[in-house]
């Protein structure tokens, strides 16, 4: 009767999906916590509302959202800090890497490691920022100029962005590639 136990058939699939959900939910919890701290718990704040809407769109449970807001309003835990790293990727593409962390040194080392693994490095502050403008409501970065990218460089860029987005500390990665 081996192979007839339903749990043995679904446990590996469930483990993979649960790990993926956990990673996504922890990113959203950090984002909501940071926005709630900026808004001082005001749920009417547009940036906090946007963060909550993003979390709800990813099916994050309401309990987790409430817990993240309460964590920000209380004194428990370290303060979350938003850091923006600048880099240049394959083909001269400018990268803006938005990280949210309670440990600046850890986040910097993780981003540096991922960039160096792919043959790139963090650029000086302001060296890539000129290529982007910040949207007033969503605080997302939009490229002011775009750079055409060759096919082989595009593959390297996609791999780099994927590796950065898989990092726990990194929230978003913006590029000015066409």
Question: Which ranges hold each PLM region?
Answer:
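Short, structured coil/loop segments at alpha-helix boundaries
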Residues: 22, 45, 150-153, 167
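N-terminal cationic and glycine-rich segments that engage phosphates or anionic surfaces
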Residues: 1-144, 177-178
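Short, low-order "capping/linker" segments at domain edges
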Residues: 133-165
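Short acidic amphipathic segments
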Residues: 160-176
């Amino acid at each position: 009767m081996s192979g007839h136990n339903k749990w043995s058939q679904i446990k590996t699939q469930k483990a993979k999906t649960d790990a993926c959900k956990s990673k996504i939910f922890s990113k959203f919890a950090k984002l909501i916590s940071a926005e709630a701290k900026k808004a001082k718990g005001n749920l009417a704040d547009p940036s906090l509302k946007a963060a909550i809407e993003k979390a709800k769109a990813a099916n994050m449970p309401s309990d987790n959202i409430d817990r993240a807001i309460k964590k920000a309003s209380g004194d428990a835990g370290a303060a979350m800090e938003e850091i923006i790293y600048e880099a240049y990727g394959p083909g001269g593409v400018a990268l803006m890497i938005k990280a949210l962390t309670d440990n600046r040194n850890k986040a910097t080392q993780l981003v540096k490691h991922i960039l160096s693994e792919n043959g790139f490095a963090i650029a000086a502050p302001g060296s890539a920022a000129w290529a982007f403008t910040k949207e007033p409501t969503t605080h997302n970065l939009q490229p002011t100029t775009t750079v055409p990218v060759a096919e082989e460089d595009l593959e390297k860029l996609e791999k780099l962005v994927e590796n950065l987005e898989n990092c726990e500390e990194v929230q978003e990665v913006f590029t000015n590639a066409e």
